[in-house]
UniProtKB/Swiss-Prot annotation:
It comes from Debaryomyces hansenii (strain ATCC 36239 / CBS 767 / BCRC 21394 / JCM 1990 / NBRC 0083 / IGC 2968). Residues 173-194, 234-300, 517-586, 635-654, 693-782 are annotated as: Disordered. Residues 708-717 have a biased composition (Acidic residues). Required for the proteolytic cleavage of the transcription factor RIM101 in response to alkaline ambient pH. Residues 746-756 have a biased composition (Basic and acidic residues). This is pH-response regulator protein palF/RIM8. The gene is RIM8.
Length: 782
C-alpha cells in the first residue's frame, strides 16, 4: 500500500504539521479530503428490503467515489440503535434520546494512523481517483433489540452509519485513538499530545462525509410459547344486603319486615328481591326468622344469587396479525336483564412514554376494534354466556415492552352495563376522526394469508381504516359511571407461530364440543354470540343456542381457539342431516347418511298421501324427460276441492287424456318429420351413394348433371331449414348424426318466401319439393 502511494504522491516533509500555517503552498495539502473531493459516498446492502432479526449478519458494501487522489483517510462503519422521544407543544415530556447500542469498526485505514508522524512516515494510506468499494459484514446484537417503529411522538430506530475523513479528525474524535486519558500517567506521550493539539485546529478543514442507512429490526415473539392466560373474575356483592340484615335483626316482627323490603325492592327490579338474609339470622333469639326459613317465599328467594359474578376468558395469550381473538364472557346476575347495548368489547392499544429519570409517564390510547353486544340474562337461571371475537388489524405491530422510553401493549377491554337500563348511543359518544395518528400504523398487506413472517414496514403517514375507527364508541364517559363494570386482560401480538399444529387441533376439539352440545341444548339457555364489523372468517361451532333476533343477521359460529388465515380451510366437517331429531349424534360415524330415495320412500311410507308415480315416457325425448323430472321435484300443491279436481290435470300423470292427446300429436309430428327426413336422405343416398342407415348395402353413382343440381339445391335448403331438425323429437333408440351446414356456398344463397319459412313444429313432408324452385344462379354452385 505504501509503495503504491509513493508512486502517485511525491515524498516530502509534512510542512503543514510543522509550521502550523494552513495557507502554506505545500503540495501535500492538495491530497487532503475536502468538500469538493468526494463525488459519491453511500452504503449498498445485499438485501436492502429485508427485515432483520437479532443475531443476523448484514452484508453490504460502502461505495466511495473520489474526484482526486487522497491520502491519510479513514472509513468507519457504525451500528447504532436508539430510542427517541420528540418534542410536543401539548406534552410535558421534553425531547430525549437514549442509545441502545453503538458499535464502530474501521473499514479502511490504520488503527494508529494519527501517530505515524512520530515514526517519520509521511503517509499511511491513500486512494486513487475513481470508485472504490469496501465490503463489510456486521452481526446484529442479541440483547436490547426492540421492534423498529417510527410514530408521531417518537421512534425506535436502527441504522448503519458510514463516515470518511482524515486520520487526524478520527484521532481526535475516537476514544480509542485519543491518548488524553494516559497523558497524566505517562510522560513519554508528549509527542502524541503535541500532535493532537496541532490537529485540533484542523478540524474545520478536515470535513467528514457521512452516509446513513436505516434498517428494520424485528424482535421475534413466538405466540405458541406464551403461557395460557388466566380468566379474569370479578365478584360484586349487593351493599343493600347488609342493610337489610341489620334492620331485620332489629325489627320486632320478621314477617312484616320481609313484606316491607319486598315492596321496596319491587320498584328497582323485575322479580322478587333476594330474601336469603334470614340465613344469617338463625340465632337462638330469632325464632321467627327460623320458622319462616322454609316458607315458599324464602324458597323462591334462595334460588336467586346474592352476588354478581363476571368472568372473562381468552383461550390464548398471543395472536398474530389478521387472527381472531375469541372472547368468552360468563355473567351470573341477581335479576333478569335485557339490554340491547349492554356489552362493549374493545381491542385497545396503549402507548406509554416516559421521560427517563424524571419518572414522568404519559399514556395514549387507541381503539383498534370494537363490538357492541346485547346482554340477555335468563330469568330462570340468571345466567348469560356471551361469545364474540375481535380481529387483530393488519396494521398492528408486535407488542413492545421493556424498552427504556417507549412501550406498546394490547388489551381486551369489556364494559358491561349491569344496571338493566338500556344505553342510548348517540353521535356524541363516538370518537371524532382525526387527520394525524398518535401511534404508528403500516400499510395493509395485499395478501395477509401469505408471508406473514417478519414483514413489517411501519410509518407515521398511514391512516388505516380511519373512517371505520372513527365510528367507535368512546368508553371514557361510561367508565366513570357506577352502573358499568370494567374488565381488562392483556393480549400479546406476536410475529410468528412455530407450533402450527395448535391451530389444527382446534378443529378436532371444536368437533367434540359440537357433538357434546347437540345433546345439551335446552330452550331456557340464552347464549348470544356476535362478530364485530366485517370480520367474517371460517370459524367453527363451539357453543350452540338461541340468539336474539337483533343479532341473527350477522351471527357467525365461533371457536375458542383462533384459526390463522394462512391455514387452508379443508378440515371442516359438516354435521349430517337427521331425519329424526331424537337420534343420538354420537352414532353419526356408525350410521350411514340416507340417500334421496331412502328418505323419499320413508316419507311416503309414513305419509297418508299417495305418492305421485313418475311416468316412464320411453317414447319421449330426453329433453321432455328432464322437464318431467324437474316438475316432479317442485313443491306439492295444496289439496283442492272436488269441483276443481275435475278441471285440474297434472301434467305428469300418464292417465290424463290431455297428456295423451299431446303425446299423440307429438308422435304425428315426429312421424311427419321422420318421413321427410327419410325421403331427403334416400334421394341424397341414391345420388351420391353415401352410407346411410336406410341404404347400408347398396350404393349408386350419379347418372347425370341434373341429379347433382337437385342435391345441391337440397343442401342449400337445409342450410336455412336446419332448425327444423333440432326441434323434431326422435326416438331414444334411434341414433342421430351430427350435421354441419356448408358455408362455402353462401354466396349463391337467395331469400326464401314466407311460405317456406317454418318454425320447426308445423312442417309438412312436401317442403323439399317446394324449396326446389331456385334461380339460374345455382347452376354454377358446383
Amino acid at each position: 500500500m505504501r509503495r503504491a502511494v509513493s508512486k502517485i504522491i511525491p515524498n516530502g516533509p509534512p510542512r503543514f504539521l510543522q509550521s502550523g500555517s494552513l495557507l502554506s503552498g505545500d503540495t501535500n495539502f492538495k491530497y487532503r479530503i475536502d468538500f469538493n473531493s468526494v463525488d459519491e459516498f453511500y452504503i449498498s446492502l445485499a438485501d436492502p428490503h429485508r427485515s432483520w432479526l437479532p443475531g443476523d449478519e448484514i452484508s453490504g458494501q460502502i461505495i466511495f467515489i473520489s474526484k482526486k487522489d487522497l491520502a491519510n483517510i479513514v472509513i468507519t462503519l457504525s451500528l447504532i440503535g436508539s430510542v427517541k422521544i420528540n418534542a410536543s407543544s401539548h406534552s410535558k415530556l421534553r425531547p430525549v434520546k437514549e442509545l441502545l447500542f453503538h458499535h464502530t469498526i474501521k473499514i479502511y485505514g490504520d488503527e494508529n494512523s494519527g501517530n505515524n508522524n512520530e515514526n517519520g512516515e509521511e503517509f499511511s494510506n491513500g486512494l486513487f481517483k475513481g470508485e472504490h468499494r469496501f465490503p463489510f459484514i456486521v452481526k446484529l446484537p442479541n440483547k436490547r433489540v426492540f421492534t423498529s417503529i417510527d410514530f408521531g411522538k417518537g421512534s425506535i430506530k436502527y441504522s448503519l452509519k458510514a463516515a470518511v475523513g482524515n486520520a487526524s479528525s478520527f484521532a481526535n474524535d475516537s476514544p480509542a485513538a485519543s491518548p488524553l486519558s494516559d497523558s497524566n500517567n505517562n510522560n513519554n506521550n508528549t509527542t502524541k499530545n503535541n500532535f493532537i493539539s496541532k490537529t485540533k485546529n484542523l478540524n474545520f478543514h478536515n470535513s467528514v462525509y457521512t452516509s446513513e442507512k436505516i434498517i428494520t429490526l424485528i424482535n421475534p415473539i413466538d405466540v405458541s410459547k406464551l403461557p395460557r392466560s388466566k380468566p379474569k373474575r370479578l365478584i360484586i356483592k349487593d351493599p343493600r344486603l347488609s342493610k337489610k340484615l341489620s334492620r331485620t335483626q332489629s325489627s320486632t316482627s320478621t314477617l312484616n319486615t320481609v313484606n316491607t323490603f319486598n315492596t321496596l325492592s319491587s320498584n328497582n327490579s323485575d322479580t322478587t328481591t333476594n330474601g336469603e338474609f334470614h340465613s344469617n339470622g338463625n340465632t337462638p333469639g330469632n325464632s321467627a326468622s327460623q320458622s319462616n326459613s322454609n316458607s315458599p317465599l324464602n324458597g323462591l328467594d334462595n334460588a336467586r344469587p346474592q352476588v354478581i359474578k363476571v368472568a372473562l376468558e381468552i383461550p390464548e395469550r398471543g395472536f398474530l396479525r389478521g387472527e381472531l381473538i375469541p372472547t368468552k364472557l360468563n355473567i351470573n346476575h341477581s335479576r333478569k336483564i335485557q339490554d340491547l347495548n349492554g356489552i362493549i368489547v374493545t381491542l385497545v392499544r396503549v402507548c406509554r412514554l416516559s421521560n427517563g429519570h424524571e419518572n414522568m409517564v404519559e399514556s395514549f390510547r387507541k381503539d383498534l376494534q370494537q363490538s357492541v353486544l346485547p346482554l340477555y340474562v335468563d330469568p330462570n337461571t340468571f345466567q348469560s354466556e356471551i361469545n364474540t371475537n375481535l380481529r387483530v388489524p393488519a396494521d398492528a405491530f408486535p407488542t413492545i415492552s421493556g424498552c427504556p422510553l417507549v412501550s406498546f401493549q394490547y388489551f381486551i377491554e369489556v364494559l358491561i352495563n349491569l344496571s338493566g337500563k338500556s344505553l342510548i348511543l348517540d353521535s356524541s359518544n363516538h370518537h371524532k376522526p382525526s387527520i394525524s395518528t398518535d401511534e404508528a400504523n403500516h400499510s395493509l398487506l395485499e395478501n395477509p394469508s401469505n408471508d406473514l413472517k417478519y414483514k413489517f414496514n411501519f410509518n407515521s403517514n398511514a391512516s388505516m381504516n380511519q373512517n371505520e375507527r372513527s365510528g367507535f364508541i368512546n368508553t371514557d364517559k361510561y367508565k366513570r359511571m357506577k352502573k358499568f363494570l370494567l374488565l381488562t386482560t392483556e393480549v400479546i401480538i406476536g410475529t410468528n407461530r412455530s407450533n402450527e399444529r395448535s391451530a389444527y387441533t382446534s378443529n378436532e376439539r371444536s368437533n367434540e364440543l359440537l357433538h357434546d352440545n347437540l345433546n345439551s341444548i335446552s330452550p331456557t339457555s340464552r347464549k348470544s354470540s356476535s362478530v364485530s364489523g366485517s370480520n367474517d372468517s371460517p370459524l367453527l361451532f363451539n357453543q350452540t343456542g338461541s340468539t336474539p333476533p337483533s343479532q341473527q343477521g350477522h351471527q357467525q359460529p365461533m371457536s375458542l381457539n383462533p384459526l390463522s388465515e394462512a391455514i387452508p380451510a379443508n378440515n371442516f366437517s359438516t354435521p349430517p342431516y337427521f331425519e329424526n331429531q331424537q337420534d343420538s349424534p354420537l352414532n353419526i360415524a356408525d350410521t350411514p347418511i340416507p340417500g334421496y330415495e331412502e328418505v323419499s320412500n320413508n316419507y311416503h311410507a309414513n305419509s297418508s298421501l299417495a305418492p305421485v308415480q313418475m311416468p316412464t315416457h320411453q317414447h319421449l325425448s330426453e329433453k321432455e324427460q328432464i322437464r318431467a323430472h324437474e316438475a316432479s321435484l317442485l313443491p306439492s300443491a295444496p289439496p283442492l276441492d272436488d269441483a276443481e279436481e275435475t278441471e285440474t290435470i297434472s301434467p305428469i300423470d300418464k292417465n290424463n287424456e290431455i297428456l295423451e292427446n299431446i303425446e299423440e300429436s307429438g308422435e304425428e309430428v315426429n312421424q311427419l318429420n321422420n318421413e321427410s327426413n327419410d325421403s331427403a336422405s334416400s334421394r341424397h343416398s341414391q345420388s351420391f351413394g353415401f352410407f346411410t342407415y336406410q341404404n347400408s348395402t347398396s350404393t349408386t353413382t350419379p347418372t347425370n348433371h341434373e341429379s347433382l343440381e337437385e342435391e345441391e339445391e337440397e343442401e342449400e335448403d337445409n342450410l336455412y331449414h336446419s332448425n327444423n331438425l333440432s326441434n323434431s323429437h326422435a326416438e331414444i333408440d334411434s341414433e342421430s348424426t351430427d350435421w354441419v351446414p356448408n358455408y362455402e356456398t353462401a354466396n349463391h344463397d337467395i331469400l326464401l318466401e314466407n311460405d317456406h319459412v317454418s318454425t320447426g313444429t308445423n312442417m309438412h313432408p312436401g317442403r323439399n319439393a317446394n324449396s326446389s324452385a331456385r334461380g339460374p344462379q345455382q347452376d354454377n354452385s358446383s
